[in-house]
Amino acid sequence: MWKRCLAGCLCGLLLSALGGCARMVPGASGEPAGTADSGSERSEYAPYAGLWGLTAKQRQEDFAYFEQQLRENYPCWGILERNGTDYEAILDEYREMAAQTDNDFELYVAVNSALYRLGGEGHLSVIDPEWFSGFQDVYNELAENGSAEGETRERWREVLNDPVTAQNYGKLLAAVTELNAGEDSSSNPDAPAADAENVTTLIIEEGKIAYLKIDSFETYDADKEALQAFLGKVKGYEHLIIDITQNGGGSDSYWMDLLVTPLSKASLSSTNYALVRNSPNTAPYLAEAFAADVLHPISELPQLPALEPRDRELATHFVETTLETEPLGSGFDGKIWLLVSERVYSAAEAFTVFCKDTGFATVVGTPTGGDGIGIDPVYLCLPNSRLLIRYSPLFGLNPDGSSNEEYGSIPDILSPAGESPLITALRAIREG
């Protein structure tokens, strides 16, 4: 058994809170770029043609490497096939764009847009230049302080701190910033308001029903005091409703330390299977995250009724991931309800899985977005541009063997079509 890293490391990571995929092309539209024939785009990107000083051959090498490594390492091809994603046509289109362009920035656009079109399953995305330094900071801090389990994630830090990679991302950030200058952020309806509160609290019925809404598991330090105060205030209530319907992820440490530990009354443990492709790019990360005897040959995986043959075919090994918590104090005496939706992803999904496995909370709402079983996404570094592509190295399974990324978690109580999970939960409370 392996106890999952509790340091968070933006697991689910920062981009997950923005919808689970990276920014696609500079600009507020969020739409993928067209082919290399798009004259307006070529004109816009012209000042950045020599961004990294690459030759035409180097740009083509990068895209070829990107494509080859994706085929060898990415674990979610089965999901794309079941979704009807024509990934061969998508890769063909952007391979041609990378071959035709004489512009370094358009290589970034080609890779970024290809990943957008592939759908972002399993955290698949380019590391956004606007978030690069944030990832560096988190892993550098982890290296200095270690996690609760003594983990440091050295492989992750090594890739992010490569001097050429950091320099190239600095140049890319400058270009993206210049291209985005003057854009109206209001044109992106998903962009959070600058002063939006991450935590919302409400007393629905004095002494009986308390409501806590958390939109992200990223802001641990900023939210810690407010959460402690509110949970202390409602400790004697009969019901606590925790709403994560808009929560796209963040850090597992957030929900484990700030919610489960203070509210639970006993030790809790959740164990899940995950498939692994112990392939060339992924192997160094797995070697750091797992002891050798934790990686079990796929032939030893128990029979699971909903496991897709294609998913098993891609895997070389499997692991059992375990999350464990200990109570802090006397806990919450009442009943806890967790509200979820399709927007729940990554670390928020991990919380949902934990609640269902342990009974910590009754889950109410609609099926979730998934990808909450695993470890931090790993990086694929293109050799010339040093662009970083991330993907989840573990393919998490629900108890029946179905893909957690694909199907998410099914709530204990499903909300009827058109009904908010809060109304569903309040009705369940009223009906006893």
Regions found by a protein language model. Name each.
Residues M1-C5:
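Positively charged n-region of N-terminal signal peptides that target proteins for export
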Residues A17-G20:
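C-terminal motif of bacterial Sec signal peptides marking the signal peptidase cleavage site
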Residues A22-V276, P284-A291, K335, P367, ...:
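Flexible, low-complexity junctional segments that flank or bridge functional domains
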Residues Y87, L91, A292-P305, Y407-G432:
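Extracytoplasmic/peripheral linker and loop segments enriched in polar/acidic and small residues
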Residues A110, L124-I127, W255, L307-R310, ...:
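Long, folded non-catalytic interaction modules
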Residues S251-G334, G374-Y379, P393-F395, S403-E405, ...:
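Gly/Ser/Thr-rich loop/hinge elements
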Residues K335-D357, T362-G370:
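Extended C-terminal subregions enriched in glycine
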Residues V364-L426:
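C-terminal regions of proteins
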